[in-house]
Amino acid sequence: MTGISFHLSPSEAATRSAAASFAQNVLRPSRATYLSHSSHPARFQATRPTYATAVSSSLIKSQLSPALGGTGGSLVEAALLVEECYAVEPSAALTIFATGLGLTPLNIAGDPAHAEFLAPFLSGEGAPLASLVFSEPGGVANALEKGGAGFQTTARREGDEWVVDGEKMWATNCAGWDFKGCELACVVCRDVTDGEEYGGDPRDKVMIVLVTRGDLERNGEGSFEVVRHVEMPGHSSVSGPHVRYNRVRVPAKNVLCPPGQGAQVAFGSFDASAVLVGAMGVGVMRAAFDAALAFAKRDARGGAVPLLERQAFADLLSGIKMQAEAARALTWKAAHALENGPGDYDARRELALAAKIYSSEAAVKACTDAINAVGVTAYDLDQPFSDLLNTAIVLPIFDGGNVGIRRRHMQELMLSPTYDAWASTFGPSK
């Protein structure tokens, strides 16, 4: 995608076509399989064959940059992939994309020296999971506030090793398929080598430590445990449990980001994922629109004409369509701008934040509008609407909640003395 054109390039069109095929032929059938299980953990484990197909189809390798041996393309292509998958089967898709988020810190800060950590994800074999282990049971929205408690998961230097201690929650894939740890966890933690008390900028102490499944096995039983599996109303095959690291020792080479660099890389990872959450929202809106449109064409609710000829129904449906188109345009623009500009990084980042906030909140409204249009029939579980709503309601509150994190980051940008409001569209004003 270049200039102002919205025509997909041959590469982008091929990505979309391949994604649509994968969604229909691999993701869609997985739903019936995992829904046959009653517990959340069992549903997650039931998606392993689907995930393995994603691995063998290079969907995991494609989430790593070419500089690291991957086949990753542009962020616009990633957004196209995410939309196609979320329009069909969000839950099984999220496990795939969460590994991409787990690998993003390495895309930002990794180098060839990290080849051993990346090898499982480049092989095209098995079902390796990665996770960005960020959130904590008590929340982290204000973890960088001076004078606050900060991240409660800590790392302490002891000789040639770092010792990781603490509890995390909501980190998709972090427990692995057998709940004994994933192949690679990028654990965001606070350096306490010089003690718990620190009066400076909390960012100075934030670091990212790589914890592999091999590290956990070397540390022995009890070093990693699942405290509780979280049952969720949507994304019902996704695993993001409450976990605990108990004095997990890793070698110094496992430090991806030393103290002082971890926050920038962690939030940089979430800048990229913000765009993809925008695409998730578009996928959900698209599914809601398509389902409501199909209903309106075949059902008259006892009247003489199909519902689509009723003004009230058409108004709600056209609203969903307009919001979906607007959200997609913003998402594509944010994806292109984050990698290409114009504007400095803050200007480009603002668009990513806007795409996440607008699209995620619009997706919730689109689902409720579709439900209101269809009426009580939408409450039937044989209809897709309740599941779509349960999928949508997490989009504004995960991957950095809109209220506690994403809007606050936009506020910080606007408060900056160097804020240049339209630089991401027209370039720097000066």
Tell what function each PLM region has.
Residues 1-95, 419-430:
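Amphipathic, small/basic residue-rich leader segments at the start of a protein or domain
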Residues 8, 224-325:
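Glycine-rich beta->alpha junctions and the first turn(s) of the following alpha-helix
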Residues 28-41, 297, 301, 324-358, ...:
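C-terminal helix-coil-helix/basic helical segment that borders enzyme active sites and/or dimer interfaces
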Residues 52-119, 123-127, 178-182, 338, ...:
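Internal helix-loop-helix
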Residues 125-139, 188:
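A short, Trp-centered hydrophobic/proline-enriched beta-strand micro-motif
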Residues 167-224:
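A short core secondary-structure module
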Residues 169-176, 273-277, 394-401:
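Glycine-rich phosphate/pyrophosphate-binding beta-alpha loops
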Residues 374-430:
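Glycine-rich phosphate/cofactor-binding loops in nucleotide/flavin-utilizing enzymes
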